[in-house]
Amino acid sequence: LFFDTDFEAHASEIYDDPKWPKAPLFYASFTSLTDPTVAPEGKESGFFLIPLAPDLEDSETLREKYFDMILARLEKHTKQSIKTFISFKESYCLNDFKEDYNSYKGNAYGLANTLLQTAFLRPKIMSKKVKNLYFTGQLTVPGPGVPPSLISGKIAAELISQNTSKQVLT
């Protein structure tokens, strides 16, 4: 996690005045350092994540600008040239979440990216407001990741079987 810029300013640019952040905080992960199977021999694999407000303009120009910005900061912190070694690059952003997942406003974090929708405060599997409405996936309990998403589907199926006369395959 790179918290080398103003956290309050970035948070304000997500929640109070939604826009692409001037100096974004970001997360960097180079999984090939601990799992060599995720990159070709002699290469590394990594990704960056920048928290953004939903429903912002999304273009290749903006994506490239922000990639260059955070890569320059990473190079500054590591005192290493990285960009010249990149042989493949791909971006995934708001428009991709809308197109691939029909995600409301391109939001990658669920109904809202707020404290009240994280950890144990996530929406429960069974709706409190709508009878016989069940939620599954990483944005509900038990949480993010493939195993918890599959578990939430199994729990929802079991709840549907218990609460209705329908038998659901699990």
Locate each region found by the language model:
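Mid-domain catalytic core of redox enzymes
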Residues: L1-A39
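Short, glycine-/Ser/Thr-/acidic-enriched flexible segments
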Residues: D6-A9, T31-D35, A53-D55, L116, ...
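A glycine-rich dinucleotide-binding beta-alpha-beta segment and adjacent secondary-structure elements
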Residues: A23, Y27, Q80-P142
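Short glycine/proline-enriched loop/turn "hinge" motifs that connect secondary-structure elements
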Residues: P36-K43, K124-K129
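Conserved FAD/dinucleotide-binding core of flavoprotein oxidoreductases
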Residues: P40-R73
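Hydrophobic, well-ordered secondary-structure elements that form the walls
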Residues: F48, L74, L133, G137, ...
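A conserved FAD-binding loop/helix module that cradles the flavin
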Residues: Q138-I160
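Active-site-proximal substrate-binding core of FAD-dependent oxidoreductases
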Residues: S161-T170
